[in-house]
Amino acid sequence: MFQDNPLLAQLKQQIQENLPKKEGTIKATEKGFGFLEVDSKTSFFIPPAYMKKCMHGDKVIAIIRTENEREVAEPQELVEQMLNRFIGRVKMFKGKLNVVPDHPQLKKMSLKAKTKKGLNPQEFAEGDWVVGHLIRHPLKDDNGFFVEISEKITDADDKIAPWWVTLAENDLPNSEPAGIDDWQIKDDADLERIDMTHIPFVTIDGESTKDMDDALYAKKNDAGDFELTIAIADPTAYITPDDEMDKVARERGFTIYLPGRNIPMLPRDLADELCSLIEGEIRPALCCTVTVSKDGVIGDDIQFFAANIKSHARLAYDNVSDWLETGSCEKWQPSEEIAAIVRDLYEFSQARAEWREKNAVVFPDRPDYRFELSEDNDVVAIHADMRRSANRLVEESMITANICAGKTLQAHFGTGVFNCHAGFKPEKIADVVELVNPEGTLEFTAESIATREGFAALRRWLSKQETTYLDNRIRKFQTYSEVSNQPLPHYAMGLDIYATWTSPIRKYGDMINHRMLKALILNKEPVQKPDDSVGEELALHRKHHKIAERNVADWLYARTLADAPENQTLFTGEIFDINRAGMRIRLLENGAAAFIPGSLIIDNKERIECNGDLGTVSIDKEVVYKLGDVLEVVLADVNQENRSLVAKPTQVFAELPVVEETQN
């Protein structure tokens, strides 16, 4: 009788129009109900029936009404849906295709699905990994959620899943770009390449490295200063800005480095063969020579030139480090000529490191965690590789080369691709001073730490403190590193200028800088200058690559450490973040991140306080943990679905003594 009654519908609409409305974000719970979060302090309850119209993360407008003496929100209008393109797993329901999103808050949702035109639904099985697109939403078109599957990523039980799924999730390629049959050198007709094949350059890389993009040569002169030559692989000899391959390189931005594998920015036949500075092979290169004083000061005699070079020795980090640190190496005995070059390079690197420690900023040594995989993509071991003498030798050479490029590009063009860092966020400078100089007895003032010199001096002072507590606190007040086409300083490195050109096989920005440096050599206008958007593009690529690297690592850690809770394996954890729910630690044995909830420190909310602002955990108002502390832990839970680790300190905090009431 009342069905489709226009008067009733009109009355209902009028009532709804008079009810208050709020815009907010949906927060789902595991129990079916949810909340509309309007801001950090305001939220409204959403009953299970209303939650069926939306999903976690949706931004909606909801009407607020009172039901059973409680204010509730009923989502009415979709502002922005949380899911668009997403990764999920196939779930068969009564023989019909469904997709479960691979998202911690959405894993209980099974969404009806179809395959896009050209895909055979019969080829999909339970648990397969797919790319889905949410094409229907209840708040948009009065129908249930509906998904179109555009791509199958891999089978349910494929061990390659962590890599392929993560790359698909971030919309990144999972293979190298296609090469061409006949690469030709396309140098400017006026570019002269100096024959330097007689100069005994050496490459120092990892044992398995194929894309060797830098070769080094140093000679100590009679005054004790170092004449350094850096030769860098030259892919822009083969690729012009108008080539299709240049567009591909720009779209990729960087070679993607994931645990156990990489996805090159350029085709492997170029990166690993034609451009790679392979021992005994003549290669085109872009070179820089500079004199560095015995005190580590970079001279004004910086020169860039094009050359043909030949690596005279392919060396490995560990072998060179063993030889430098102990005087011998079982696996490698250098000729007198190569030994002299390596020794001079090492002495140069020590002079530069000493200069940077006094005048700039040297980052603390932390291990590089490396996953060793079997042919079946199982983790065989996780190695903590410390940076050794040879690593530092190459690092100092590259930093020197990039300072030279920065100075040159700034002086001649006033533009280029520069790595920059602005120091502290302006609005946080007063907080930094209050933290490090509360009594006003130190040299650090709001004015001084706003300068590059003052920022670097503060970082050097922090590195000498007994604990890393202040260093960890202050990191939150820093800006992020950026890529810019303007010559801006790099506060975090303590340098006036920094422009990378030493990895053009792996970084598109370095290719641009190569073209500009060649223009300088030719005394012509550059064939390519960095536009205003290139910095943001490269930063976005870098962000997605970092997320992908972390996600693959988290997945592999969860697989590898699955038995650790049962075995009660002991780990050493370093606290790197504290919030009101608990603290986050890095396991020093393998690099995995784990969360320690407050309840696993002590199961009494009244006694514990986790203070994110101060970076401390207190029990009974006494600080027991702070940022930078190292503690012994066991893993309490390894969640394979969320790829997350929960840890628990082995330290047990005593119960409060029970005070017995005395009878009068």
From Swiss-Prot:
Tell me the protein's name. Exoribonuclease 2
Q: What cellular component GO annotations does this protein have?
A: cytosol
Top-level division of the source organism's lineage: Bacteria
The listed locations are: Cytoplasm
Q: What exactly does this protein do?
A: Involved in mRNA degradation. Hydrolyzes single-stranded polyribonucleotides processively in the 3' to 5' direction.
One GO MF annotation is:
RNA binding
What family does the entry list? Belongs to the RNR ribonuclease family. RNase II subfamily.
